[in-house]
Amino acid sequence: FVPHVRMMRTDYQDIGLAQLFGLPFAVLRKPIPFDTTTMNFNWQVWDTKAFSLYSRSTDRIDPQGAELAVSAVCRFLARMNVITDNVYGGYESTVLLEEELLTVKSQASGLFVPLVSSFTSVEKGQPLANIIDPLSGEIISQAVSPDVGIIFFAKDDSLVMENEILFKIVGKLHK
């Protein structure tokens, strides 16, 4: 992922507070039925501000990503006058609706070889990844960008199944 803060779209979200973390993006997403069982959703329903921070990697140790997340929390606390430390200003967060992200799915199963990573600018039609047949070593499919934008999410595993999400792209904001 591109480091970002997420909030569920309830009647209680506060995107202005989410932007105080100073991460590149603040993402709003529609809750799904499962979310009603989560603490994050219920905190919002009971008028508590609740945020989820996403760093670059979720299943590997990423010291740089962890440092960025800690800085974001410290930045938020400093901007809320909870702590008095001086913290780097961070980004002016761009607000996104999750359903507006462009999705690129695999057209075949095989070995996944990405050609771009998260936070990379891409052009319409640009190759994003190759899917390779593990038996022959030949490229059997290629994922391409559907539009101009920035890679928001990039799959990180070596194996891919057909119809699996490979990339999510922030489309060009000003057309």
What feature does the model see in each segment?
Residues 1-175:
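Structured catalytic-domain cores with a bias toward divalent-metal coordination
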